[in-house]
């Protein structure tokens, strides 16, 4: 794997240590498993709208080349492959790749998993219709350089979906104190609150990277139903954005 200025070795090491847990819905990635239906709802709706696809079709994303950056064990890569996309999953943590490959094989899916970075793929001339950049930007050393590499990975007219965590007292209380210290859904230190990014900051970075932000929504956890939903108004903790490369 080529080195990159945006890769934070300490952040990679955190996820390396949890690699075997990816497909355990009750393990260390339980929050992602719970959030996944909400993430997939947003992703599929945005792709369908941008590329005029019918989600009721058997393979609505057939013909689209999709990159899942920070793919981990493949929680998003696999559903995208089932919808017909040609999927490349990239992760900077080497131990995640064999876990993802094995699960895809067991699921009868063809997914190209690679231990590489956004910068290395861009330098190699790889281009995609869709780039998924989910819960990654808060873990990199240089968000603007990273998002610029994501822009280079998109074909003109391509779509980037980016999700992250807002930075405010509520997100500290819920994502750090609640999720890591009290509920212990995640190991302590999984997130660094100082690296969280407000929606306005992210929009500014996306524009500076050369992309046009077109949508953003909150992803809100309901502790009563124990489920996640999209919100047009509440972006106070988790949120997701859609951006397009125009030229």
Swiss-Prot record:
Pfam family, one: Methyltransf_23
EC assignment: 2.1.1.222, 2.1.1.64
Methyltransferase in keyword set: yes
A Gene Ontology biological process term: methylation
Catalytic activity: a 3-demethylubiquinol + S-adenosyl-L-methionine = a ubiquinol + S-adenosyl-L-homocysteine + H(+); a 3-(all-trans-polyprenyl)benzene-1,2-diol + S-adenosyl-L-methionine = a 2-methoxy-6-(all-trans-polyprenyl)phenol + S-adenosyl-L-homocysteine + H(+)
InterPro entries the UniProt entry points to: SAM-dependent_MTases_sf (IPR029063), UbiG_MeTrfase (IPR010233)
Binding-site residues, S-adenosyl-L-methionine: 39, 70, 91, 134
Keywords: Methyltransferase, S-adenosyl-L-methionine, Transferase, Ubiquinone biosynthesis
UniProt pathway: Cofactor biosynthesis; ubiquinone biosynthesis
Transmembrane segments: none
MF GO annotations: 2-polyprenyl-6-hydroxyphenol methylase activity; 3-demethylubiquinol 3-O-methyltransferase activity; polyprenyldihydroxybenzoate methyltransferase activity
Enzyme class: transferase
CDD domains: AdoMet_MTases
Membrane found in the keyword field: no
Function: O-methyltransferase that catalyzes the 2 O-methylation steps in the ubiquinone biosynthetic pathway.
Assigned protein family: Belongs to the methyltransferase superfamily. UbiG/COQ3 family.
Protein name: Ubiquinone biosynthesis O-methyltransferase
Organism of this sequence: Cereibacter sphaeroides (strain ATCC 17029 / ATH 2.4.9) (Rhodobacter sphaeroides)
